[in-house]
Amino acid sequence: MATTLTRRAALSSALGALAGFALHGGATAQSARMPFPRWVEAFRTRARARGISDAAYNRVMGSLKPDTSVYALDRDQPEFHEEVWQYLNRRVSDWRIITGKERAREYAPLLARIEREYGVDRYTMLGIWGMESAFGDLVTNPKHMRPIFPALAALAWGEPRRRSYWEAELLNALVIVERGWGDPEEMIGSWAGAMGHTQWMPEVWLNMGVDFNGDGRISPYGPPDDALAGTAKYLSERGKYRAGEGWGYEVRVPHGIRASGIRPISAWQAAGVRQASGEPFPRPSERARLWQPVPEGPVFLLTHNFDAVKSYNPANTYALAVCHLGDRIAGKGPFAQSFPGAEPLPTLAEIQEIQQRLTALGYNSGGTDGRVGKDTMAAIRNFQLKVGMKPDGYAGLKLLARLREAA
């Protein structure tokens, strides 16, 4: 987040801190802290200093039990565990592309208004919305979300090395309740406290939130107006998003090119770099850097707005998925160069067939809607373990072939 920690950079630091904590068990760090009820009473002083009334504090914290399961959760973001092509195929899926096009039509007036107000392209917003909550499908899904106060309180009380961050976010969440923007019972989100359509942390809700639908409160839940507008404001103010510019280009480069750094696209052209589409670059004076995620895979020239998206999540693969999903929703095609070892992107019908075949074999895939969620991934892993495949939970064509063999 510009001068502030990025929304996910803070979480990444906290995740790293949790690694050693979880390896030794939650009890070790907790034993060095005062008992939770005493901590809650001591923390009241901090809350009062932020203008939180005793009534609001008691409502949230009075009978709260810490959700210590957060200590044992996976410590790393998935961007760092999957092959890049798997990460992209999972997120820039046929379901997300089709659903994104539907949302683009359904919310065209809202997205146009956001573009006018903040200068952020509608397809960038659709990419983030699709990535963060599957266009709202996961916002209140209990299999993906949990009450945030038990989780944040556990982290603020017992997480050893990023305690100040979690304390601040717990206070921010309490301020939201004090202002009447959110009801504690309805404030559910990720284990780390990210909420709503575009997964706002409490600090983002407080400082970047916008009452875009004019209902008198700011909320990342319900209609997506406030969530999308607040995220566009975030990209504009903290990411310095530039209106009217893209995020970058897939390119072809001469063999053995050694040029690096950030330079005008005209300089890259002089070095032999060309758009993979064969089209001329529309803004030769725009500055860009060259990036190839994996050897022998596609190569990209990344411009400023790619980094604006990274202000929301600093992982390159996240930003690439957001931008590529937005492009696919806009009607553009897949990358010209495939990733080495990549399977073709499964169609919606193929994903549905995977789910149907898993269900027929006795695995709970959670439905046959063509969206791969936690239930489908768990069912895939169980099947993969049974048949001796790598249990990566990936719903691909190799898996479909094995399922067809097992029928």
Give, region by region, the residue ranges found by the protein language model.
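N-terminal secretory signal peptides and thylakoid transit peptides that target proteins
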Residues: 1-18
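C-terminal segment of N-terminal export signals and the immediately downstream linker at the start
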Residues: 3, 22-50, 59
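An alpha-helical appendage that flanks or caps ligand/catalytic pockets
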Residues: 293, 298-304, 334
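Short, solvent-exposed mixed-charge patches
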Residues: 405-407
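Short acidic, glycine/serine/threonine-rich helix-capping segments at coil-helix boundaries
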Residues: 346-351, 359-403
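Catalytic glycan-binding domains that act on GlcNAc-containing polysaccharides
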Residues: 54-285, 300, 309-321, 325-326, ...
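A general alpha-helix detector
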Residues: 39-46, 110, 151, 354, ...
